[in-house]
A protein has these predicted regions:
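Short, acidic/turn-prone active-site loops that include or flank metal/cofactor-
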Residues: 53-57, 74-79
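Short beta-strand elements at the ligand-binding edges of bilobed clamshell
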Residues: 65-77
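Hydrophobic alpha-helical
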Residues: 1-57
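Alpha-helical scaffold segments in soluble metabolic enzymes
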Residues: 34-38, 62, 82, 86
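Hinge/cleft segment of the Venus flytrap/periplasmic-binding protein
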Residues: 78-113
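Generic structural signal for well-ordered, non-membrane alpha-helical segments
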Residues: 5-8, 76, 80
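Flexible loop/hinge segments that line or gate small-molecule binding clefts
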Residues: 56-68
């Protein structure tokens, strides 16, 4: 969906039309609002396991309502900090500096913060 909800909704609508046996959906990008809208209008949200990225207010509501089953969340502030550290190390020619891996959190309806 090119990280655009207006594109994502059309892609998911088509996917749902073409695959009546679909049991799972994974959205790696943005555009989760399009996924939500397409699933809710299709009346199939309870039949399809849905995993997306980034715990936004829309994703939170979709988890609570049961439209989404899991959200993989990364702390974007830490990601930006690590990216800046990596760029500084590159500019300083410090080939030994490696930022640590970014922690992932997986949220479901029962463990929302």
């Amino acid at each position: 969906g090119r990280d655009d909800s207006t594109v994502t909704i059309e892609v998911v609508r088509q996917l749902l039309r073409d695959h009546d046996d679909l049991i799972g959906l994974y959205n790696i990008g943005a555009g989760n609002r399009g996924v939500i809208e397409a699933l809710e209008e299709s009346q199939r949200k309870d039949d399809i396991a849905v995993v997306v990225h980034e715990l936004t207010r829309h994703a939170r509501r979709a988890l609570v309502s049961g439209t989404f089953d899991a959200v993989i969340n990364q702390n974007y502030k830490i990601e930006v900090d690590y990216a800046i550290q990596a760029l500084k190390a590159y500019v300083d020619s410090d080939v030994t500096a490696l930022p640590p891996p970014v922690q992932l959190d997986i949220y479901m309806r029962d463990n929302l913060p």
